[in-house]
A protein has these predicted regions:
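Histidine- and acidic-residue-rich, metal-dependent catalytic cores
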Residues: 2-234
């Protein structure tokens, strides 16, 4: 008899995201619930393209797990040098490795749609000045969405006017026009954006994302467990 297990895969991705939050807070001073905020911004932007169902769930999982290789990268760097500036090093030198490792790791997760190169290219800039010099039309849509959402959250500025000015200033530079338009379509005023600060976004996140338990064989379950182990074992 074939052994199988029923799993809420998106809920598990949320748990992995929490583990990543703890690690990012320790090493790179990223504020709490970063992955979930990136996921919330991403799925709100997705409405612009009418992304629904399996695609929306896979976008949310990619967003929740976009920094999945952080511990793997930091662990390797610490083996070389016990004193490193992780925040500076990640942002300036080794972003490409963080993306390469993350893309490889994510293949262990049972997505329903094709998410190839989403994690690999999630730090690319629309004008081709990112780590792999890919321009916006060479980058998967999900990667472009996550890149904008990730950047907005890392900025950490709650001023709606500042965010709008920043996006318009970097339109067709850091971000493509479609994604800028999608963000401004999703968050039309400061009140809609403020839920990211008051914590209410998390309830809204789980209300929007399609969730249901799926049945997986033991090999898939082991792959998922191995993925989680890479995050917490450092």
């Amino acid at each position: 008899m074939k052994e199988e297990l029923s799993i809420d895969i998106i809920g598990l991705a949320g748990a992995c995201s929490y583990a990543l939050d703890c690690i990012e807070a320790e090493f790179v001073n990223i504020k709490n619930k970063h992955g979930k905020r990136v996921a919330y911004i991403s799925i709100c932007m997705a409405e612009y393209w009418k992304i629904q169902g399996d695609e929306l769930q896979d976008l949310a999982m990619c967003a929740l797990l976009h920094d999945n290789a952080l511990t793997q990268y930091i662990s390797e760097e610490l083996k070389k040098d016990s004193v490193i500036n992780c925040k500076k090093d990640l942002s300036e030198k080794k972003t490409n490795l963080h993306c390469i490792y993350g893309e490889k790791n994510i293949t262990k997760i049972p997505f329903k749609t094709d998410v190839s190169n989403v994690i690999l290219y999630h730090h690319e800039h629309a004008d081709g000045t990112g780590p792999f010099q890919k321009k916006w039309n060479e980058i998967p849509l999900f990667a472009r969405i996550i890149h904008l959402a990730d950047t907005i959250d890392i900025i950490g500025n709650n001023s709606w006017n500042f965010i709008c000015q920043y996006l318009l200033k970097n339109r067709d530079g850091l971000f493509d026009s479609e994604c800028v338009n999608a963000f401004l379509h999703a968050f039309t005023h400061s009140e809609s954006f403020m839920c990211l600060s008051d914590g209410s976004f998390e309830t809204k996140l789980w209300e929007i994302i399609p969730r249901q338990k799926q049945v997986f064989d033991w090999k898939t379950c082991k792959n998922v467990a191995d993925f989680f182990a890479k995050i917490v074992d450092y």
